[in-house]
């Protein structure tokens, strides 16, 4: 719960060498497998989970093992094998496995473009749950890829209703507002795009992308002078960023559209 995963894994390994952790059933092994999986050691994690599939183990242990195996298969892109693993999970999983199973199914359905089935699960998730903003973001992205920008923006905007203020949530909020802005832009709703881009923090990780989009939304509305303000601010940032590079090309384009050819030539 403190996100000290390496320390937790180290303590588990030390405890195992000293005879194991008593009184916690199969939980230490499940956690150890999860840590190995998080560090990309899939073969070691898989060996642990497959060992937990023994029929003598409790059902909740086998459910957890199959769930983690399904996750690994999903991450490898083997969707058929993911479904096969999920079929082994009981109809009444317990504890955290319920939420993890639902979240995996949402992502699996999205990958298969079964958006209504994914949405049916997401609609049951409370705004208070930690996973909610990530599920909303994934649903929004899926609708945007299908060019259903209205639904995409609706899910992006759900994130604005959440009161979490951790840095992780604020970054996701910025990412959602930036993506919503581009969804409006692609849907030729330039004024709405501008309003979304304005909600992104100027010192956040998505500010460059938002400044670029803000400018293009103004260009689409033929407000070339207004486009220059965010682009000029962006052009003063690191040149390594592709958004900055695009802004430096976009600035002379805006001058050209304003029939200020000497300025355009100088900027080119």
Predicted segments with their positions:
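Acidic, polar-rich low-complexity tracts and alpha-helical solenoid repeat scaffolds
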Residues: 1-268
């Amino acid at each position: 719960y403190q996100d000290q995963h390496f320390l937790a894994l180290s303590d588990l390994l030390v405890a195992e060498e000293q005879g194991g952790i008593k009184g916690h059933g199969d939980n230490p092994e499940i956690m150890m497998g999860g840590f190995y999986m998080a560090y990309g050691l899939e073969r070691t994690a898989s060996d642990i989970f497959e060992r937990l599939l023994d029929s003598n183990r409790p059902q909740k242990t086998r459910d957890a093992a199959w769930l983690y195996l399904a996750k690994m298969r999903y991450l490898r892109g083997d969707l058929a094998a993911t479904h096969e693993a999920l079929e082994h999970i009981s109809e009444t999983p317990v504890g955290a496995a319920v939420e993890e199973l639902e979240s995996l199914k949402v992502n699996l359905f999205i990958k298969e473009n079964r958006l209504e089935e994914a949405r049916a699960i997401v609609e049951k998730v409370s705004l208070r749950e930690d996973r909610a903003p990530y599920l909303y973001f994934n649903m929004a992205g899926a609708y945007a890829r299908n060019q259903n920008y209205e639904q995409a923006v609706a899910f992006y905007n759900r994130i604005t209703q959440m009161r979490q203020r951790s840095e992780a949530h604020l970054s996701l909020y910025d990412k959602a507002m930036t993506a919503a802005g581009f969804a409006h832009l692609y849907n030729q709703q330039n004024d709405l795009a501008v309003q979304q881009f304005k909600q992104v923090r100027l010192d956040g990780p998505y500010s460059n992308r938002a400044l670029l989009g803000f400018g293009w939304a103004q260009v689409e509305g033929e407000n070339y002078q207004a486009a220059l303000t965010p682009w000029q601010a962006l052009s003063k940032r690191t040149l390594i960023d592709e958004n900055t590079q695009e802004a430096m090309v976009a600035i002379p384009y805006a001058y050209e559209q304003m029939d200020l050819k000497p300025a355009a030539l100088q900027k080119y």
